[in-house]
């Protein structure tokens, strides 16, 4: 009987997925946990079942699932997000080198969406906004500008950025999403923003989070991200920007401006993701820290010129 149970669990896609989700949760990658759980629930609704065998996840099954999502009125971005999460789970469960997977030809791209970047003139308008010192709007503006100055650093990495990650004139941290080590030389513009919060008696650089460990920290981060995006909408109106700011816009803005200033594409790839993660990794490995520092210095001088 025990052997039968073990065989059943081994063949259960849902059971294996839960094992992976538990492992990811133990690594405190709560956003990934949320994505995996949401995608898995969606798949089970399509299958009208509480469990699925690994063998039942075929290319036809995945194709049918994506068609079902479309008929449910789910956006292409969400379909892509669900599919990427399920593919990641499947690959961890059933990965075999050189073997095609049911997700090989599934849609996992990014359709054309609303404009995701702003111009240098918009950044200058933000910089010139007169805001009350110590206000939440002033903090949100500082964070947005800081993200831009730091190669489009994601909000989550800024929120959790610790003072001990700054030393010898450089910010060194690991991206929470990819675990890649990032090294950012501290230019004068970056130093100025950090200095505004140097008196805060806390381990984090910015007074954004009140919780820093475990599930509570993730919940706090989600609340603060929502507040931050609300503040960015307010700042957009105050600065009379034609494009509404969002937290996700910073990295695209850095990449777009860098490209316009003839920064090499392989350098820009460190700020923008690729459809193929392997391609991104190849580009990242080829980036010299000095190249990156010089590219960022040129860009910051261009944006902050009077």
Model regions: which residues?
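DNA/chromatin major-groove-contacting recognition/catalytic segments
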Residues: 183-188, 196-197, 285-306
